[in-house]
Design a protein with these regions (language model features):
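Glycine-rich flexible loops
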Residues: 1-217
Length: 217
């Protein structure tokens, strides 16, 4: 719930995105309900099994619940997913001139690439959820053309950190593009930097420290 409040206050969610977390040691996951505002209570977290059956929680499921269901099914390594509609990251999906790449240290978390799912429609069906999971592949995140982004993590700290720095990197890249030709980080350097950040978990600790402060009621 702290993660939701943090992302809402930071403008990532604004009533349209959603967060999910796999429940450890089970074949179930929690997903924030449809039309959730800044205020969140335990019943706003819906619990589903891998057959799509709702086990707990109150309220309607998000229309794009297949995003979470199909990625969890396809990626046993993923334990948390965030879908949001970041202004700057999404802008790069509609540019014929620029492809979003790491341009800032923390953006190297996505040095493995940012595949684009080329369907702007809501991921509201099983078929589209499967297609998105396929587009994501083994990557940390994917962009949805003219729509938004999906960020995964081994835990909630990783997914929140990923969403935070995906949008920050996109914002910095946008500013660089407006100044002229952007100077992207060399891929080899980006891969080395990413490995170090992931190994030390420094970014995760720092972002989660902000969540602990800003995510209170």
């Amino acid at each position: 719930m702290k993660a939701w409040r943090f992302l809402y206050r930071r403008g990532f969610i604004e009533g349209f995105g959603h967060i999910s977390v796999r429940l450890p040691g089970t074949d179930t996951y929690m997903l924030t309900r449809h039309s959730l505002g800044r205020i969140i209570v335990p019943d706003d977290m819906l619990v589903y099994d891998m057959n799509g059956k709702q086990l707990a929680g109150k309220g309607d499921r998000p229309g794009e619940a297949p995003i979470h269901h199909e990625i969890f099914r396809a990626r046993p390594d993923v334990n948390s997913i965030i879908h949001y509609h970041g202004m700057h990251a999404t802008a790069f999906t509609t540019s014929a001139e620029h492809t979003l790449r790491p341009i800032h240290l923390m953006g190297t978390l996505f040095a493995d690439g940012l595949p684009i799912y080329n369907d702007p429609r809501l991921v509201s069906t099983t078929e589209r959820g499967v297609a998105l999971a396929k587009a994501l592949g083994s990557h940390r995140a994917a962009l949805l053309y003219a729509h938004g982004g999906v960020v995964t993590g081994g835990d909630i700290e990783e997914s929140v950190t990923g969403a935070f720095f995906l949008e920050e990197n996109a914002h910095r890249a946008y500013l660089s593009c407006t100044l002229g030709k952007p100077k992207w980080i060399d891929p080899e350097v980006a891969n080395d930097a990413a490995a170090e950040l992931i190994r030390t978990r420094g970014p995760m600790r720092r972002v989660w420290a902000m969540v602990e402060i800003e995510g209170v009621e």
